[in-house]
Design a protein with these regions (language model features):
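Carboxylate-rich, polar loop motifs that coordinate divalent cations or form catalytic acidic clusters
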Residues: 1-207
Length: 207
């Protein structure tokens, strides 16, 4: 774990060893294997925040919601939720969690490598979107890497086989893929990451 000083243009090593997840929301959180650490600015050290009990658990991503629940994605054990008073639950019990996204309505969208897309509503109910070959309006693949909400409230979802736009009002997914005959379209159908800038423009990274 390294810190880069923009003024001095120098790096400072804060923590040795592998770091599996990094997240910032008021504080800097990192995941190392089955442990979550929080950076203590006053001491310059990383303090242990939580240890996930179990075998072969490796964290993949972190997210802190407005209720101070810490959501922890893993590489093979699904999704855990740690409340502010350190009560642990496991809303998703299996799968490799690629990313966690919170939209403007405070719903969570959980992207997975093989289990499709999970939607965790504010009432804690969970919906799982999977590809259905018989339904052209379903998500195009179960290998979901990232998602991002646009200014109109639509959710853009990056998968191994294309970009999906999900409209909450209709519950339908629209697919966008690369087409050599459309020079103004996607250059590659495999979408790795998505982000929205301050002007509302959606940026895509392909792989």
């Amino acid at each position: 774990m390294a810190e880069f000083d923009l003024t001095t243009q120098r790096f400072k090593t804060l923590l040795q060893g592998n770091v599996d997840a990094i997240y910032f929301n008021e504080k800097l959180y990192i995941g190392k294997r089955e442990e979550v650490f929080v950076y203590n600015e006053s001491t310059g050290n990383f303090d242990l925040y939580y240890h996930l009990a179990g075998k072969d658990i490796t964290l993949s991503c972190l997210h802190l919601d407005e209720k101070k629940n810490l959501w922890m994605g893993t590489t093979s054990n699904g999704l855990y939720c740690l409340s502010g008073d350190k009560k642990i639950s496991q809303p998703v019990t299996r799968g490799n969690i690629a990313s966690i996204y919170e939209d403007s309505s405070k719903e969570l969208w959980i992207c997975t490598w093989e289990e499709g897309l999970y939607r965790i509503k504010t009432d804690s109910t969970i919906e799982n979107f999977r590809h259905d070959p018989k339904n052209p309006n379903s998500i195009c693949a179960d290998f979901v890497r990232s998602c991002c909400e646009d200014n109109a409230g639509n959710l853009w979802i990056g998968t191994f086989h294309g970009l999906n736009r999900y409209e909450k009002s209709t519950g339908k997914f629209q697919l966008y893929t690369a087409n050599a005959n459309k020079p103004d379209g996607l250059t590659h159908s495999s979408i790795w990451c998505i982000v929205k800038d301050e002007q509302g423009t959606i940026w895509l990274g392909t792989y």
